[in-house]
Each structure stands twice: as structure tokens, then as C-alpha cells.
Amino acid sequence: MAETPIVYSTEGAAGKPVVVVHGGAGRRRHPFTPEREQQAAADIKRALDAAMAVLDAGGSALDAVVAGVHVMEDAPEFNAGRGAALTSEGRAEMDSCVMTGDGRCGAVAGADCVRNPIDAARAVMEKTPHVLMVEPTEAQCEAWGVETAPQPYFILPERERQLAELQALPDGGWDKPGHGTIGVVARDAAGNIAAGTSTGGVTNQQPGRVGDSPIAGAGTYANQQTLAVSCTGTGERFIQESAGYQLHARVLWAGQTPSDAAKAVLEAVEERGGDGGLICIPVEGEAVVAHNACAQMDWGYAFGDVRVTHN
């Protein structure tokens, strides 16, 4: 029988601007060295500081989320942006989504030329009539004012080594999903909430595979009636469970607390053979971090002068 998911919550953040960051959850095939663990924790703190700087200046939850995601996408320790996992063809195909509590949403999938995929996701939300766009081109990014980067920028030696190891296995399997995917959720001084998620997918995935991260209601969701959430883990299972929306629905209609709802969602994911975690911030109340007991998760939160990181 599966163990009960592990849940943490902030203490003292209720009613205050707050940010929560995750650096992915799952079963690591390639454990971090102590040095990389330290660097990952430092990067999470930098992301928290960047997001809180926005909130402390009176900025919006959306701007805070994008600022935090930027830091994580630029950090090679995480499977997003610069550190993206590689497909079976040795290319980076990245997915990202951003959503605000009023229902606005933008996402990209299969992005292969966007330096910071979260910027392209925001551009889809703010500069097009669409919600999800696949393989945004350099011309589109230029029109949106979004910075591009060539494939070599994303292809790191460590990721090439991981791909080669997997392809040398008898079954040519793919990596354990989830680890390194990044997400940020925030609540600003006005009580507005937002969520953003960014990922490079899964090492050795087939070209064109899309996980839960860019799917509103699966890996990313925000609703001003309840909460903002970013998920990480076995993407296919989070999609099947409509994890982000399910969390919202359990709080809104079943009357569950965010903590209890998070446990129930992750139990449902595990029943399908998946694992992972999530971070969420309610419109009111304490922020929540949760992950399956079998999964490892990197995360942190910040409010006021408080900074907490865990990995």
C-alpha cells in the first residue's frame, strides 16, 4: 500500500505576499553531488529573492512568478531552459505555462529556440488570442519581443551524458519524469495569485512529447476562487488526473483544505503508477508543499524576511 504523501505548510504567511518555488519531484536516476545540491538550494533561494523583490515593491503575482521562473530557467541544475533534458534525437524541446487567478493563461510546447520559455508563454497570454502554441518560431518570438537562443545554448554535456546512458540500456528507456521541472506560485499584496511552470520534459522522450507542465488544469492552474498550483512528476499521470484543476475542485466543492486536497491528488497520481509533487498558494491562508513519499523534491518558500529551502 502506498505511503501517505508528505505535506508541509508555511507558518505566518496567511494574508501576506508569499512565493513558493519547486525544482522538481520524482525518483532521481542521477543523484546530485553535494556540490550540486548546494548550488540547487542557492538557485532556489535566488529565485525566491527575485520573486519577493517584485512583491516587496508592490508588484503583481504574475510578475513575481515570471521573475522567479527566469532564475530557475537560467540555472543548469534544473530541467528547464538552460538545463533542459534532451529528446531521443538529442534536442531540447521545452514546455512552459503561466496562469493568473482571473483565468488568463498562456503556454508553449515544444519550444526549441526560446531562451526563457516562460516569456513565450506570457507572450501567448498577452499578445495573442490563443492559450497554447506549439513550436513558436524565431519570427514569432521576435514579434513578441521574446529573446531567442540557438540549440547549442541548451545542450549541456551533462545532459548529453545522461541521454547516452539511457540509450545504451537494453530497452532504450526514458528517464524518470519530473526531476528538475521548475515551478513558482505567488500571492501579491492585493491577494491576487498566479502560477508558472517550465520544463525540458524527459530525457530520451520521443520528439513531440508534451507533459503536464504546459497544460492548464493539469500541471499548472490558478483560480481566484481558491488557489494557484504548479505540479511536477510523471506528467502523463498528472494529465490523466487533471491534477491542478482537481486540487481546485476539491477545495471549492468538496470543502477540503489545500493540504488534504493535495494529499488526495497525489494519492490518485500514485494509484495510476506515477509520482511527484506540487506547490500551491491559496487566495487566503498558508502555502502548501506536498509530494509522494517515494519522491524526492526540491522546494522553498518566502514571505517577509522568511526564507526556507529544502532539498
Task: Please give the residue ranges for each predicted region.
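Alpha/propeptide regions of enzymes that mature by internal proteolysis
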Residues: A2-N311
